[in-house]
Curated annotation (Swiss-Prot):
This is Uncharacterized protein YnjA. One of its GO terms (molecular function) is peroxiredoxin activity. Signal peptide: none annotated. The lineage of its organism: Bacteria, Pseudomonadati, Pseudomonadota, Gammaproteobacteria, Enterobacterales. To M.tuberculosis Rv2313c. Pfam families: CMD. InterPro entries: AhpD-like, CMD-like. SUPFAM superfamilies: AhpD-like. It comes from the Bacteria.
Amino acid sequence: MGLPPLSKIPLILRPQAWLHRRHYGEVLSPIRWWGRIPFIFYLVSMFVGWLERKRSPLDPVVRSLVSARIAQMCLCEFCVDITSMKVAERTGSSDKLLAVADWRQSPLFSDEERLALEYAEAASVTPPTVDDALRTRLAAHFDAQALTELTALIGLQNLSARFNSAMDIPAQGLCRIPEKRS
């Protein structure tokens, strides 16, 4: 049995819980584990907010796909759930979401998305397998600001997904994908 979630959200995190309810309709589960260390929860939340800002040099779909792939790699149920919701919202369908695990074989992804997903996978394995050839292709496609933010996003998603997976934080049903009818 893992560490149980907090039954009561700390007072200092209640404004964040209110924002969750406002945006998602419910409080997101990780606050009940991260809430044991509110300062770090706020730092992670601010980091997420910065990377998800409207003026980010990274396309929102690219950010969502990268996060979804890392969530899958880390076997984080909660992260797969929330990133799936974001991919579906940002692409307007579930097509890319359903194909992200097999992005290499799918014709649905742009060159930019493929490069970002390749980098996310290479940077997320232990040890990372980012080589000079990949760095050269990344530098040819992304400017320094975008590449730095992409790398930060990969690092942050790994932190979040690994924490949530290790704590066994469950999915919340944020992204319900309808089953295909035969």
